[in-house]
């Protein structure tokens, strides 16, 4: 059952630079297509093509996989062939001021309408000024005013005549109009009144009372006369305004005969101007009519100081919130800060005389408005972090309308009078970007999510490594270098990058499509090329970038290795010991991982077949590690204790472990330590072991095999390579090996060895130097084999247990 050590060419799958037919990446063209994401691209193509309800897309992939750039390029390519969506405008609703109306215009015509309406209002202002200042209008206006004056004059003349007939005259006093007696044209003073008889005074008072009642009738008619005059003045204003602005509006309406919504708006606008022409004329500095007031309206902010436009004219603007005049194809919008208002739009307010006021001109578009008719990209984590944003987006997608809402109004925190803009019809394809765990969490806990986002575009972080993909990868490198304005990469440097890409995914048969990691490596390689004064990135520049990145992150690794070298952490790399073995684990520090050897010990005693995981007992072991330990008991019982009870109690521990332990990659090492303790056969300490094991004794693959091998190699190298040292790995992990060059060179010099094993029996033979032993037909193992010693050791424990149980029972009887 001999196992051959791995050859150097099995430890690292190199990328021969000779396979490339270019000298540097300057000679290569950028990739026309996307690389390594066929599944995600198929999902995107399907999701974009499906126009049914709920076929929005969730792009799931880890950060750095390049999903944003890929999706953006994909969407822009698709959008270029699509129609430009319409412009979106808000205009005043003259019937309900707080409910502005929308106008959906063909692309580029919204701003055109706004400019035409602005010019129209200039013409209206000039026409009104000319009409109201004309001699004819002034004469008619004066005639209306004269009518009121004549009525008042006739009424007072009648009162005057009646007063004279009664020897009285009207006098104006602070208390009102009074009538005083006269003699010979002179008003009688109080002393003269006293000289009159009672009868004469009574007669005068009676006449004065009659006149007072007549005067009261006149005063009661004056407000009615004034109302009649005002109505005539308004009608005069309307007639003059209609005559002045009618032709102006008719000309503009004729341009939009095929757009009923626009002509309807222009008609209501004309009617409002006709009804409020006096207000417009007053705002322009004209002579308004006394007592005339504008129609009811919300308070509006004034920007007269900035634009020269009066507040009264704001109501006739066209607020273009989405202008697609310069858009080519359908829009592709990325919302980086997806708050509720940034998504759905908002109504701004200004402080005006101590109150917050607004109007339809202060409606602002959200990203859903700008992306309407196209595509909206949103980071799902960011939208979940914003209050009300996620619910607002779902509500818009469900209803197919964009309704502008403020967070304060949604929770009734404020009672400020605001607007209720008419909702905008929504036609958009939303692409959420996020990590896979978020996708599955939202899908599990939000029942509406699956109804709205029916398409999942799953982005891979690796792709197959074959000659065609390696050539495509070289073009990818060329494209990134050009985009980032980096030095060209020589073909030897390209080969090195490809090898490092395989190392990044921990698989010699795969390449990383983690675009952020690749781009960072290329940038850093370019930096070292410039530092070295070359004009092309070489292999040594790429290697320097790799080494420098490790050096910046490996302080903790060096500290641990120093503690091992100084015997603060006890790790043996020579000799043999019973029940002790070197296990291997991986420590992750951000994006840097390194291997660390750990001393695992096993101790046995008489018991009831339990294997105690000390890490679990003190709550330092994870569930996967505990599962691996329980598998060991199953293996021991099934293989060695079929004819007698498993009568041992064993304890396993990672010595000098002061943090949590999880994973089952050390379960084979723990089993070897147990077998050594049971058989009392020492294990070589010059070897380290990694690999999980099943109940049948098969060694299973693990992760981080490269880091684990290198971690033990570094310790052995620091103490001096003896040629006896090495690492035992699962045979199925050979395909994942992309070891450092110094490890490969040590193996080539026979200073270090890598042993691939498939079964526990193969591993125990390497560790002890003794044969494992195969059972015969009777189930007996060859003498002096490891399995025979284990079998005998467990049988002896069973006999002791039986003897102990028997003596204990006899003692109790006695």
Residue ranges: model-predicted function:
Residues 25, 182, 603-605, 655:
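Generic beta-structure capping elements
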Residues 321, 601-603, 653:
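Residue-level recognition of well-ordered beta-strand positions that form the cores
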Residues 359-368, 374-387, 391-393, 409-419, ...:
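Peripheral, non-AAA+ core regions of ATP-driven protein-machinery
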Residues 1-443, 448-470, 474-491, 495-536, ...:
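Conserved ASCE/P-loop NTPase catalytic core
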């Amino acid at each position: 059952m001999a196992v051959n050590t791995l050859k150097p060419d099995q430890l690292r799958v190199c990328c021969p630079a000779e396979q490339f037919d270019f000298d540097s990446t300057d000679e290569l063209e950028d990739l026309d297509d996307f690389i390594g994401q066929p599944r995600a691209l198929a999902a995107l193509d399907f999701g974009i093509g499906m126009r049914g309800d709920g076929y929005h897309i969730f792009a799931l992939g880890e950060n750095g996989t390049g999903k944003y750039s890929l999706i953006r390029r994909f969407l822009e390519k698709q959008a270029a062939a699509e129609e430009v969506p319409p412009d979106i405008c808000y205009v005043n609703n003259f019937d309900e001021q707080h409910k502005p109306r929308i106008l959906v215009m063909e692309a580029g015509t919204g701003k055109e309408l706004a400019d035409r309406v602005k010019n129209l209002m200039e013409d209206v202002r000039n026409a009104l000024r000319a009409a109201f200042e004309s001699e004819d209008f002034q004469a008619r206006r004066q005639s209306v005013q004269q009518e009121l004056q004549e009525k008042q004059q006739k009424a007072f003349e009648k009162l005057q005549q009646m007063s004279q007939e009664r020897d009285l005259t009207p006098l104006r006093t602070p208390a009102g109009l009074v009538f005083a007696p006269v003699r010979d044209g002179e008003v009688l003073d109080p002393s003269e009144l006293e000289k009159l008889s009672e009868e004469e005074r009574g007669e005068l008072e009676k006449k004065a009372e009659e006149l007072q009642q007549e005067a009261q009738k006149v005063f009661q008619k004056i407000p009615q006369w004034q109302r009649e005059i005002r109505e005539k003045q308004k009608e005069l204003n309307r007639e003059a305004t209609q005559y002045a602005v009618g032709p102006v509006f008719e000309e503009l309406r004729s341009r939009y005969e095929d757009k009923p919504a626009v002509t309807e708006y222009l008609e209501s606008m004309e009617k409002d101007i006709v009804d409020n022409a006096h207000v417009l004329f007053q705002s322009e500095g004209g002579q308004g009519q006394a007592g005339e007031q504008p129609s009811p309206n919300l308070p509006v902010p004034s920007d007269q100081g900035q634009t020269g436009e009066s507040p009264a004219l704001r109501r006739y603007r066209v607020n273009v919130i989405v202008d697609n005049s310069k858009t080519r194809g359908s829009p592709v919008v990325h919302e980086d800060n997806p708050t509720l208002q940034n998504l759905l739009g908002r109504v701004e307010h200004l402080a005006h005389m101590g109150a917050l006021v607004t109007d339809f001109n202060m409606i602002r578009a959200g990203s859903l408005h700008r992306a309407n008719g196209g595509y909206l990209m949103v980071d799902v984590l960011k939208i979940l972090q914003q209050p009300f944003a996620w619910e607002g987006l779902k509500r818009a997608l469900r209803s197919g309308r964009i309704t502008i809402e403020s967070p304060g109004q949604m929770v009734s925190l404020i009672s400020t009078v605001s607007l209720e803009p008419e909702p905008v019809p929504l036609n958009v394809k939303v692409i959420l970007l996020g990590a896979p765990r978020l996708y599955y969490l939202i899908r599990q806990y939000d029942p509406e999510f699956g109804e709205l986002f029916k398409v999942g575009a799953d982005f891979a972080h690796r792709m197959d490594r074959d000659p065609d993909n390696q050539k495509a990868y070289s073009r990818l490198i060329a494209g990134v270098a050009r985009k980032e304005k980096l030095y060209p990469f020589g073909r030897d440097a390209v080969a090195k990058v490809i090898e490092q890409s395989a190392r990044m995914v921990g698989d010699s048969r795969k390449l990383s499509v983690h675009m952020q990691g690749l781009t960072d490596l290329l940038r850093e390689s370019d930096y070292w090329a410039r530092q070295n004064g070359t004009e092309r990135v070489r292999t040594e520049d790429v290697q320097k970038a790799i080494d420098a990145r490790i050096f910046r992150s490996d302080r903790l690794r060096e500290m641990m290795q120093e503690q091992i070298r100084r015997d603060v952490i006890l790790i043996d790399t020579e000799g043999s010991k019973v029940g002790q073995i070197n296990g291997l684990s991986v420590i992750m520090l951000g994006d840097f991982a390194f291997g660390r050897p750990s001393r695992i010990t096993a101790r046995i005693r008489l018991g009831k077949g339990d294997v105690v995981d000390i890490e679990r007992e003190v709550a330092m072991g994870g569930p996967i590690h505990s599962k691996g330990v329980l598998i060991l008991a199953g293996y021991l019982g099934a293989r060695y204790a079929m004819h007698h009870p498993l009568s041992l109690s064993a304890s396993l521990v990672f010595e000098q472990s002061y943090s949590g332990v999880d994973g089952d990659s050390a379960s084979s090492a723990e089993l070897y330590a147990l077998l050594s303790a049971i058989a009392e056969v020492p294990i070589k300490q010059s070897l380290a072991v990694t690999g999980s094991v099943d109940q049948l004794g098969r060694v299973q693959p693990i992760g981080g095999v490269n880091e684990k091998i290198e971690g033990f190699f570094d310790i052995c190298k620091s103490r001096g390579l003896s040629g006896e040292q090495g690492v035992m790995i699962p045979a199925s992990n050979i395909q994942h090996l992309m070891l450092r060059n110094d490890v490969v060179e040590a193996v080539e010099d026979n200073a270090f060895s890598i042993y691939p094993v498939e079964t526990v029996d193969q591993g125990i033979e390497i560790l002890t130097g003794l044969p494992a032993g195969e059972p015969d037909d009777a189930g007996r193992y060859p003498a002096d084999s490891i399995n025979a010693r284990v079998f005998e050791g467990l049988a002896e424990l069973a006999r002791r247990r039986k003897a102990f149980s028997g003596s204990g029972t006899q003692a109790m009887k006695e």
